[in-house]
Amino acid sequence: QLLRVYIDGIPLDLASQLLPGRTKLGLAGLAVHIHLHAKAQQQYSDKQVSQAQAVNLSKAGFRNMLDSLEKTIQPLKWEPQGTEWGNYYNITNYSDDALKTKGEIVGRFVEKAAPRTAWDLGANNGMFSRELSRRCVETTASDIDPAAVEQDYLAVKANNEQHLLPLVIDLTNPSPALGWAHHERESMLERGPVDLVMALALIHHLAISNNVPLTSVAQFFAFAGKWAIVEFVPKSDSQVKRLLATRKDIFNKYTEEGFEEAFSAYFTIEEKVSIPGSERTLYLFKRK
């Protein structure tokens, strides 16, 4: 969210305020590159400096500074705590066999659609995104949870994966066009459309948690991609029951029939498969 506001980078003084106090200790690393630099910037912000007083850093000096920055950044690690979906696949109601079968069905759908580009929305740690990327589909895997995206990113980095880009995106409040005249950074939708949109275990969160009508979800998917792989999770599923436990069930159209009706306005149902060992159904849609 900070990078939406500061598209050229987070200001030094703000970064200095946000970092833990322990990073101010020592004479190297973050203490120098962030805190001392921010202090010096603030000290000289209202002072005039002549050209003669300006310090010209040599090429070697720039290289040394970059080396120091790299050595400061490389050891930094983030251990996320208390995030919503970072541990999702350890607590989901899918059995190992059901997860495996689900992956096989998704893979078959991908091969049938034969996309070159794809968005996996609500991708979590990218488990099923790899059914796309391993088939050389240029895939953006997005999720609202930074911990899940971090897991995905670390796996991409460790395995040198070339076709998968993990991003933190809140689909109910996606990245808008930013910058001068809204042209410096394109919005999420302006970066599409793609050949295929995938939304697994996501529809119930959009429709129930965020009150987005199924017709609006279908319209968005049709705008974003030619094909769609969508998982429908019924009200009888434990995850939907959990969502409805704290709110009144006003979602009369959230049924399998209502879901198919909403999506049929924009797509044809190419294939529909129930996932064994679960109450969920996978759909392959093609835009009309």
Language-model segment annotations:
Residues 1-77:
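N-terminal auxiliary segments of SAM/dcSAM-dependent transferases
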Residues 153-191:
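S-adenosyl-L-methionine
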Residues 198:
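A conserved beta-strand element that flanks and buttresses the S-adenosyl-L-methionine
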Residues 138-143:
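Conserved SAM-binding motif I beta-strand of class I
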Residues 125-137:
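Conserved SAM-binding loop of SAM-dependent methyltransferases across substrates and taxa
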Residues 220-235:
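Conserved beta-strand signature within the Rossmann-like core of class I S-adenosyl-L-methionine
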Residues 114-124:
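Conserved class I S-adenosyl-L-methionine
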Residues 205-221:
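A short, conserved alpha-helix within the catalytic core of class I
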